[in-house]
Amino acid sequence: MDKFALERRIAGLELVHRVGLALSAERNHNRLIERILVEAKELCHADGGTVYLVNEKNDTLEFAIMLNDSMRTALGGTTGRPIELPPIPIRAADGTPNHNNVATYVASSKQTVNIEDAYAVANFDFSGTKAFDVRNKYRSRSFLTLPMLNNGDEVIGVLQLINARDRVTGEVMNFGALEQEIVEALASQAAIALDNQMLIQQQRRLMEAFIQMIAAAIDAKSPYTGGHCERVPVVTEMLTRAACDAREGPFQQFDLTDDEWYELRIAAWLHDCGKVTTPVHVMDKSTKLETICDRIDIVKMRFEVLRRDAMLRHVEDGGKLGDAELVRQLTALQEDMEFLERANVGGETMSPADQQRVREIGARRIFVDGRDRPLLSDDDVENLCIMRGTLTDAERLVINGHMVQTIRMLEALPFPRDLRRVPEYAGGHHETMDGCGYPKGLFAGDMSIPARIMAIADVFEALTAQDRPYKKGKSLSETMEIMARMKRDHHLDPDLMDLFVRSGVYRRYAERYLPPGLVDAVDEAAILAIRPAQLSLPEIQDRRKRWADFLPRYRPLVGNVLGALSVPVPGGH
């Protein structure tokens, strides 16, 4: 080898090395494929080229990108223009390798094919190429087709270059042995870079599918959560996109990289993963007396005993008090039972007078199993006296504690560096701007923008949800009125709420997910006009104290509730 050829070879390999480093740093799949072809064309000064990728499922070669300089053609890759050519079968209909096409031959044989003139070969079918040339007044002559082999010696694609050109005259020439050697080295490095990227993408898809499976299982665990875990990511991404697109205001500098978008999506899908530890009988508690069953039926049986006793006394006394008194007693029992049934639903705020009536009814005595006992147990009375909703304070703490479990579960996972904020994003959607949320009592300044976005998404989805058996979904205007009050009261970030309204995210979501009859007019001006009072934040040590105080209260209570089912306390020792 003469000195000039040696220098060219060394220079070419050095270029391959530099290109290989650049390829290994490229994170975008389409850009990587495009760069592989562009660099290969440059190394050989080729007029055009194609990258095919193997579709293992269909056993075909699929067109990934096509470039041709003299025809000014660019399809696939990052161009946004699709390649409307069908995939090429790697095997014939009888299962034998398809050796008629040069690209599929290379994919099957794992050997490079260097053709001086496509019109002069007989062992490959170039009829399609010739027809293309006629239509486009082009002349395809020299072809260099190389397999792209990964570390496992598996073909993941094929690189094909067309019409090498003299760098001085521009005339079409053959691909020389040196050019072939250099491009083979490039194809090898490119295949490894591409394979690594494809493996990362496959791992990401697997992780996303697994996470979505967990979210679907949580939604399926209880009809009371419906499709919440599936829809919160939708609202989260819509509002985040609006923040990234903002060109003025508080979010004009806000943006996310591809990795940060992935991190946010993972967090949104996992935001309620702690609910896997929440007892179903607490999460699905639709009436005040419901546990594994609704204990109102047991109370009804006790009232039947009282009715029986009243009628027996009437018979035993010979009717001395008269039928009217019996009717009065039975009517009073019926009224008290109906009152307890209404109280059990928890649909309205319970007044102190109604709570007192529950206690008086509960204090009555009943004789069962040879024992004299109160009509209602202390636990019955406590539950029936719940002022709002159906949960006791202890049960509410257990429900709220799903955030503790979410944070603990996620913080225990060995997330890579680009996913390290998943616990923070997912664990903050019940926090409020004024520090009155749970479980950590964070303030606005303690929370990232994505965490605050997720808080809005969680509230909005919960209020508009139509698939909850215990409530009707609210109209769009009702939902936004509630969220406007939450903005005023420092529960939701006011700047993000304004963006939520101005960008129209709330309406686009509603038009997609809500029945048309509930998508009504919203007074946007009134919401935007709300200006919350200035917050006065306590010292950081006081803010941290809320988290420290929450755990000691939470763990014994969740232990008591779960203990009834002989379930170990999550995170307990």
Give the residues covered by each predicted segment.
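Regulatory loop-to-helix N-cap segments in sensory/regulatory domains
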Residues: 1-7, 126, 139, 154-156, ...
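Signal-transmission/dimerization alpha-helices at domain junctions
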Residues: 1-3, 108-112, 158-161, 181-203, ...
